[in-house]
């Protein structure tokens, strides 16, 4: 019986083993079929990857094949993009043909000095991995759109652009002397009334409106001091004169910010705040809280006080509060009658109609409410009334009508229509064939024609730059509008100081421009130091040269306004996600408006980027701090040099660099330097 059982068990076991082997064979067969279907795609990917040898490989002189996988592959295969230099070997100077020397301009190609491959490296990473980071996807899209945009530039006839027309608006606008809008029309226009040609001295704007009743708002800062969870009653509104045409796609500068706060101010009193703002950087506020300002001649504005007096309650005091009624009667009885001072309450009240008149005077703005002068705000350097091309009214107020009269009837002097001045006086010298002291890369947006022109007319006229002891170049990407790109190309060909990067410009990709500056400073010129700055940064070139001359040439240098242990903002407008920056703090980094690195650091950055080992982050100044930290740890010690005179927020005394300077402020700062007075034109 045991033998029979044993035979029976063995039969069952062999049957199960037979079924398992069949199952494994089926899986193997399915896998072979899968490979057969995927093998052609695999061969195609291998061919694409093997077609690029990186930055150190030899490429042709005139073309660069850009290949992308996935759904974008068919769109970009076999795309030829021009590159004017040899891709292999070091290049130190620009070669200029005799014809170009005679004509004074050169034909601009889309990939100057191999910069297409900077963003191209980001693209090639897509061929090496299925998953792309948000940054890589963004760069991917910008590269493709930029390549197409550059092709469209060749089809666009720049000569057909009317110099009197705005390349931002696409049409010539009339300059009416008066404009009126009712409340409904204003709401349909997002509460903005256009003033096509700005204001002039004597222009006035009358606003008829009613402040809304206070509502509760959360103020987290107050929750620590009170038990109301930070909830306060707020009733306020803003009247702003904005420069709508001074920056396309940017926050317009606020030439005047008028903010009546009926309830909700931090001092629990009604106030009227006046200020200016340029590129989201506010100036010093002028606050009127009912205390009259001085009558000294140096603080008056066209003879008016900056702040008038009003009472702190709703009762109108017809007699000075320091005097009692008895004292006043006694003085009149003995013949020493004193004329009582008339005071008024705060000019705005919830639910009550007001008539506000804003008038542009000779030295400043004057605000009248109900026919009474309330405050005056002096014009600030760099902000001109002719640039005030829009009136915005926001906040807790119902507007019934707005009337603007005596407006400017001609286009502003610094408008984009007149931004570029094609004069040989402002042309850049050619790149020198010998080493020089400092290379300066200036980041600029495509449509910043006024900013670039202001830089050419000011600190780029420094003798060190004119003699090529210092070399400066703009680094500019492309714009969605083909007429803007066409004008950029014309500007670059004429002045010879622009390096065009063929990807679509956006803030998150500024770091690619920084890498381009490093590559240019290493492979196309010979300078021991490289400086990065912005087109709204005014540079005192002689001060910068003195600073780098004080550093030993053997040392690696990182100089600027350094930040230590700064943390990413995880909430709000400038949020940095944990995916973008997983660390809790940033490395030490210099503020982006102006910093200096030695050339060996730039070489390290270019080398790491060519080997795909460079970490890219959307904040270019933080990225530079990270790269310098890695260089300091792996290569050789770096001398970190800090100075507050690399001013991040505006201008400071004895500055090296001044940030957030408008074109008018640039001219003012340059005039001061020529007079031997390095003074700020607008303290912030």
From Swiss-Prot:
Query: Topology: which residues are Cytoplasmic?
Result: 1-22
Necessary cofactors: Mn(2+)
Pathway membership, UniProt: Protein modification; protein glycosylation
The annotated region (Disordered) lies at 80-102
* Protein name in the entry: Hydroxyproline O-galactosyltransferase GALT2
Record's note on what induces expression: By salt stress.
Q: Which residues lie on this side of the membrane: Lumenal?
A: 44-684
What does the pH dependence annotation say? Optimum pH is 6.5.
The scientific name of the source species is: Arabidopsis thaliana
Carbohydrate-modified residues: 103, 127, 162, 524, 632
Q: Where in the cell is it found?
A: Golgi apparatus membrane
Q: Please state every residue range assigned to the domain named Galectin.
A: 191-405
Q: What is its EC number?
A: 2.4.1.-
> Disruption effect?
Reduced levels of arabinogalactan proteins. Defects in root hair growth, root elongation, pollen tube growth, flowering time, leaf development, silique length and inflorescence growth. Increased sensitivity to salt stress.
The protein's role, per its UniProt record = Possesses hydroxyproline O-galactosyltransferase activity. Transfers galactose from UDP-galactose to hydroxyproline residues in the arabinogalactan proteins (AGPs). Is specific for AGPs containing non-contiguous peptidyl hydroxyproline residues. Utilizes UDP-galactose solely as sugar donor. The addition of galactose onto the peptidyl hydroxyproline residues in AGP core proteins represents the first committed step in arabinogalactan polysaccharide addition. AGP glycans play essential roles in both vegetative and reproductive plant growth.
InterPro entries with a match to the protein in the record: ConA-like_dom_sf, Galectin_CRD, Glyco_trans_31
Supply one GO molecular-function term: hydroxyproline O-galactosyltransferase activity
Q: Which UniProt keywords apply?
A: Glycoprotein, Glycosyltransferase, Golgi apparatus, Manganese, Membrane, Signal-anchor, Transferase, Transmembrane, Transmembrane helix
